[in-house]
Amino acid sequence: MTQATIIPRPEHSISRDNIDDIALKVLYRLHKAGYRAMLVGGGVRDLLLGHAPKDFDIATDAHPEDVKKLFSNSRLIGRRFRLAHVFFGREIIEVATFRASQIDENKSNEDSDRAHDDSGRILRDNVYGQLEDDVWRRDFTVNALYYDISDFSIVDYTSAMDDVKNKVLRLIGDPQTRYREDPVRMLRAIRFAAKLDFTIHPDSEQPIFDLGHLLADIPPARLFDEVLKLFHSGRGVVSLQLLRRYNLLQYLFKPADDALKQGNETFEAFIHLALESTDKRINQEKPVTPAFLFAAMLWGRVDEISEELKQSGEPGTIAMQNASSMVLSQQVKTISIPKRFSMVVRDIWQLQHRFKFRHGRRAKSLLMHKKFRAAYDFMCIRSMAGEVTDDSCDWWTRIQTLPPQDQDILLKPAKARPRKKKGAQKN
């Protein structure tokens, strides 16, 4: 077993002043109850990088049932990994028990607390161990640093402090095996590389080119969560670039991947601008919706099918409705899209053709539509990408700046041309 390097408090930059008070409360209660209590994972990594952690996760030798007894405000969750969530109002601290690195090989998967499928993917992993075991179950070295509340030291088994310093993302263990255990680790590698501006170590990146197909076995609901983490991190543009570099986009958004591989420059400009806009909003701490992401990623295909249906004689509105259903029904086989978001995706798409109407009831109802703003933003990005060639973006931008009475004047129906009287003689 590799010996741990202990970095004492004077030799690292983590201060309790930067650790969430609630996380400290959980750490101290576990410690006072006689358990080992360690801050672990991204929280330690981010503190060392000078970032404000989004989450503070805790690892301990207390079993989930022990944590439940110690915290009346906790709940046990998960089947694949049994965890305790400790609730303080709306804040949740995740407490995980140290996991073992291996199990008694005389036990069958059916009789043990760990199970794999035929490709090596972990289905269940509730074999508990000690800190020195748990570290080898972590994914990347930079996520395997432990902050010990008992003496405020950092415990490092994997030379992770060097990787943090050198901004290198390195898998723990054999990369082929680790990716097969959980193919989502390939997406996590891309997410961390994009988010932290790290370089994936050559030994960890090479298998990604060969194992991307394993993502097809991941449940669509889990991929939905992972896609949001990738593209709602404030680094969506970089995430897309890395997904394309490692040829993984096809396993998430095949229509977008096909369009980009075919050299569709307009769509490439559009998707880049859409992600750039989302990144900007996230970094400005403005709200974003998954619906906008899915609408953008799938727009090229839905627009293409809609045009084909119109060419075959379907009215424009019906063509877009049918195209939307076709594309979404195919996409949810890969990534599930909750109905509350898929309905907004449909609205964004189906409102696009209505921006050409600038007068009368149709224009007024569009301006009043509850999803007008999302559809308008979408249309303006299409305009910036060169897909919308008229002045629709400028016109609809201007009308939103006007007071209601001036809007009504501008939206007033154009006067109908006078109808010729029956029997009127032509000159």
Identify the meaning behind each predicted range.
Residues M1-N427:
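Catalytic cores of the polymerase beta-like nucleotidyltransferase superfamily
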